[in-house]
Amino acid sequence: MDPEETSVYLDYYYATSPNSDIRETHSHVPYTSVFLPVFYTAVFLTGVLGNLVLMGALHFKPGSRRLIDIFIINLAASDFIFLVTLPLWVDKEASLGLWRTGSFLCKGSSYMISVNMHCSVLLLTCMSVDRYLAIVWPVVSRKFRRTDCAYVVCASIWFISCLLGLPTLLSRELTLIDDKPYCAEKKATPIKLIWSLVALIFTFFVPLLSIVTCYCCIARKLCAHYQQSGKHNKKLKKSIKIIFIVVAAFLVSWLPFNTFKFLAIVSGLRQEHYLPSAILQLGMEVSGPLAFANSCVNPFIYYIFDSYIRRAIVHCLCPCLKNYDFGSSTETSDSHLTKALSTFIHAEDFARRRKRSVSL
């Protein structure tokens, strides 16, 4: 195959330039062949174990399941599926970019990574919307926040993510360059670049805006609630801290990587390249591991900041501690907030009605 008809891309999903040469695009930053195999191996081991424990603890926990747990289990499953492909990329980085595991795994692993990216972002968006409805509109949202609705939403997300990953499955192929195998895509066309740009905007930046908007509204509602109820300081600070940690983890993991991807696609669409391809390549090389690491950090975030999940994991790993008191009630912080805000909203409505009747 002609080398100029293919190109290798560091983001594994989308072609980024219609004129790139595989020899230029494939040039590795020196640290990658040593650091990335070690880093990806650590991500693989901790992520597979963490997500398996998280899924098992929530699935086999006795009693009723929280609505948010359905989204968390699906997110952990998505991360687990992605993590299974990491040994293939460890081998790729260790062999200086050569793909030694065949055409089927070249296509399949790239497709699974693409599905994981879309599925994770959409699930995180739904989780933020669910949290927004539970805290900001606790009374009105009761008819929408049902278990059957959550299962339908998750099934729809998996279906949409599988469809969005099809372009990667169809375009990725094993290519021989100088008798060396590479997992590559055909040269990008302007139509594919436009599709990649639109897909990136609507599957990352729009969900990102939704997530940030939801959590800003939640923070505003919490501030109003605690100011009205007179409960400042510790509870307010803890609630706001958890919110910002969740948002910050998402931003640190995905924003740099997708920003460089966005710039690479835009640069490929323009006749004049304002950013050298070497800078874009370096940016994706450095930020890519952060995006990959997101799949292993979620279980630790939930364990540290969600007492319900922490109890479920400890009881799953150590059944002898089933009756151990963790110093908190069986209800979650969301449950407390939902009940408190429901009372707060009812009180506000009653005050408005009373004020209106007095004015009349």
Swiss-Prot record:
Changing Y40A: Complete loss of ligand-induced receptor activation. Residues 55-69, 142-149, 214-239, 306-360 are cytoplasmic. Phosphorylation is necessary for YWHAE binding and efficient surface expression. O-glycosylated. Sialylated O-glycans in the N-terminal tail inhibits binding of GPR15LG. It is a multi-pass membrane protein. GO terms for molecular function: coreceptor activity; G protein-coupled receptor activity; virus receptor activity. Residues 1-33, 91-120, 171-192, 261-284 are extracellular. The chain crosses the membrane at residues 34-54, 70-90, 121-141, 150-170, 193-213, 240-260, 285-305. Its main location: membrane. Highly expressed in lymphoid tissues, including macrophages and peripheral blood mononuclear cells. The keyword Transmembrane helix applies. GO terms for cellular component: cytoplasm; endosome; plasma membrane. The modification Phosphoserine is found at S359. G protein-coupled receptor that plays an important role in immune homeostasis. Acts via its natural ligand GPR15LG, a chemokine-like polypeptide strongly expressed in gastrointestinal tissues. GPR15-GPR15LG signaling axis regulates intestinal homeostasis and inflammation through the migration of immune cells. Controls thereby the specific homing of T-cells, particularly FOXP3+ regulatory T-cells (Tregs), to the large intestine lamina propria. Also required for skin localization of thymus-derived dendritic epidermal T-cells. (Microbial infection) Acts as an alternative coreceptor with CD4 for HIV-1 infection. Belongs to the G-protein coupled receptor 1 family. This is G-protein coupled receptor 15. It comes from Homo sapiens. The lineage of its organism: Eukaryota, Metazoa, Chordata, Craniata, Vertebrata. The gene is GPR15.
